[in-house]
């Protein structure tokens, strides 16, 4: 993977929200140690099995994932402190008292911190009610704000209208967030459509990265960046559909989706054809196979050095390139959207005009 930083350890600059599927976990397992300190993945665990626990225990040195078990039953076996692997708990405002206590134990058992995930479309109380909700979290988990990274999750953002709707909500939440001494604050969204099976085949299709555009409009406020990798933020999306070889390839402001049915024969032939088209495209990186583990695997298939693989492999290679691209972009010298560090206690200005205190307490929503 292309190094995304000059070498010294640093706070994470990127919080991808990833499903705990084989493809995404394999991509994390192939990260270079030089970039692990810059990445703080949030893993959404919907099925607890031995494979997931085994992979979590074998992640690269320095990579400490945050784990969200909202999709699992509230039961003793889903208590993160029992898993026996280093991790950071992800806390939701609606978590039960029992789960908050368990998350606090998990936080104290490893990194002494947690991620508080506020879902913009669901947790839409006023600022005072939101403060009461996070104070409940801190009390039951026995944590303080300085131990908590706030993740504002805008969910599905797939068009310009979604960006226009999400931005003012996020700005109000960021204004509220400055009341508290958070360890950090990040904004995440997902711009990938729920399904790509309806896209044209045998040609790369460009899809705008609306999640990235949304964050660029907020980066001046000092917030960190998060997304859903190359997956969708829509619950239940990305389910197995057609079996056509598919690669979702990230560039600065777009994805190029390759779905290949050409040649009509063996899957190895179709995928080799897809990979040859990709490595000859203008958006193929100058570093080529050295850009990421995923790019290396794509080059191998273009040269017919290995078989086509499976849908999990295609997701792994796509995710690997995506993580490398985002990290390289965030660390790029002179990048316009480079954020200043988050500071609490400072008013968040409305875009294009100075900030001023609002009146009316609960009459103005926090999200």
Positions of the model-derived regions?
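Alpha/beta catalytic barrel-like cores
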Residues: 1-95, 183-184, 194-367
């Amino acid at each position: 993977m292309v190094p995304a930083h000059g070498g010294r350890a640093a706070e994470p600059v990127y919080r991808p929200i990833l499903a705990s599927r084989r493809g995404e976990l394999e991509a994390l397992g192939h990260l270079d140690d030089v970039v692990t300190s810059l990445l703080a993945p949030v893993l959404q665990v919907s099925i607890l099995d031995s494979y997931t626990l085994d992979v979590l225990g074998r992640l690269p040195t320095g990579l400490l994932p945050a784990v969200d078990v909202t999709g699992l039953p509230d039961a003793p076996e889903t208590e993160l402190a029992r898993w026996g692997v280093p991790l950071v708990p992800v806390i939701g405002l609606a978590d039960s008292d029992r789960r908050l206590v368990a998350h606090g134990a998990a936080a104290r058992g490893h990194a002494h911190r947690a991620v508080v995930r506020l879902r913009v479309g669901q947790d839409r109380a006023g600022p005072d009610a939101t403060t009461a909700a996070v104070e409940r979290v801190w009390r039951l988990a026995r944590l303080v704000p300085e131990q908590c990274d706030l993740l504002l999750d805008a969910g599905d953002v797939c068009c310009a209208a979604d960006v226009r709707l999400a931005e003012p909500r996020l700005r109000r939440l960021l204004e509220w967030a400055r009341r508290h001494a958070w360890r950090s604050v990040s904004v995440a969204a997902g711009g990938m459509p729920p399904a790509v099976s309806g896209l044209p085949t045998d040609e790369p299709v460009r899809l705008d990265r609306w999640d990235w555009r949304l964050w660029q409009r907020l980066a001046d406020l000092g917030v960190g960046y998060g997304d859903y990798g190359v997956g969708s933020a829509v619950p239940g999306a990305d389910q197995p559909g057609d079996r056509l070889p598919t690669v979702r390839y990230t560039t600065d402001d777009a994805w190029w989706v390759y779905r290949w049915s050409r040649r009509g024969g063996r899957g190895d032939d179709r995928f080799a054809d897809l990979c040859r088209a990709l490595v000859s495209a203008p958006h193929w990186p100058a570093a080529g196979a050295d850009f990421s583990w995923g790019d290396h695997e794509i080059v191998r298939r273009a040269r017919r050095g290995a078989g086509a693989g499976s849908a999990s492999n295609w997701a792994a290679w796509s995710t690997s390139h995506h993580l490398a691209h985002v990290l390289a972009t965030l660390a790029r010298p002179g990048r316009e959207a480079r954020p200043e560090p988050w500071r609490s206690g400072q008013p968040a200005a409305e875009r294009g005009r100075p900030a001023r205190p609002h009146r009316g307490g609960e009459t103005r929503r926090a999200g």
